[in-house]
């Protein structure tokens, strides 16, 4: 089994030796057994706290295997709107519910949820249920390196991307 333990920013002269297609729920995990698109088995053993993005490159410790991550199409709700104020209102209401959100010019996307779809329609937006890669914003607690301090002592763990199961 190939163990992918490093993120590679520049492949240099190395050739990509495979791809792995993962949905967002898999791309938030730092430890995961996966099947590459060509059928080979691999394991992710990555630094915690980072969402894998479509297009990222992963390598084994020796650098002999270079694997490109692909974001799998999945059930999402997509809002397209030319009115920036209305789109900002939608983002506000979704953020208020801690919904992981992909934000692009004129577009919001989140894991499909008919209740949230209805809420947005109530604001006057058009919502489409579709299959598309989902690339949510990293969020306040996902950055590299993950370093911050507090003036008081207490034990806690910050999530980096919370992706609730929507039905």
From Swiss-Prot:
Summary of the function given for this chain in its UniProt record: Involved in urease metallocenter assembly. Binds nickel. Probably functions as a nickel donor during metallocenter assembly.
Organism: Pseudomonas putida (strain ATCC 47054 / DSM 6125 / CFBP 8728 / NCIMB 11950 / KT2440)
Recorded family membership: Belongs to the UreE family.
Alphabetically ordered keywords of this record: Chaperone, Cytoplasm, Nickel, Nickel insertion
Record lineage: Bacteria, Pseudomonadati, Pseudomonadota, Gammaproteobacteria, Pseudomonadales
Record-level GO BP terms: protein folding; protein-containing complex assembly; urea metabolic process
NCBIfam families: PRK13261.1-1 (NF009751)
Cited SMART domains: UreE_N (SM00988)
Source organism superkingdom: Bacteria
Compartments where found: Cytoplasm
Pfam families: UreE_C, UreE_N
Stated name of the protein: Urease accessory protein UreE
Keyword RNA-binding: no
GO-annotated molecular function: nickel cation binding; unfolded protein binding
């Amino acid at each position: 089994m190939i163990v992918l333990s490093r993120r590679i920013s520049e492949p240099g002269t190395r050739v990509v030796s495979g791809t792995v297609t993962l949905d967002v729920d898999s791309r938030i995990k730092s430890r995961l057994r996966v099947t590459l698109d060509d059928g080979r088995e691999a394991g992710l053993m990555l630094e915690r706290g980072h969402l894998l993005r479509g297009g990222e490159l992963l390598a084994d410790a020796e650098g002999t295997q270079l694997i490109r991550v692909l974001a799998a199409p999945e059930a999402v709700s997509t809002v397209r709107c030319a009115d920036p104020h209305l789109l900002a209102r939608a983002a506000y209401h979704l953020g208020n519910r801690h919904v992981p959100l992909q934000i692009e010019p004129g577009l919001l996307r989140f894991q499909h949820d008919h209740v949230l779809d209805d809420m947005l329609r109530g604001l006057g937006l058009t919502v489409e249920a579709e299959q598309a890669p989902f690339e949510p914003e990293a969020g306040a607690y996902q950055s590299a390196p993950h370093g911050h301090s507090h003036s008081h002592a207490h034990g806690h763990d910050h999530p980096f991307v919370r992706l609730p199961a929507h039905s």
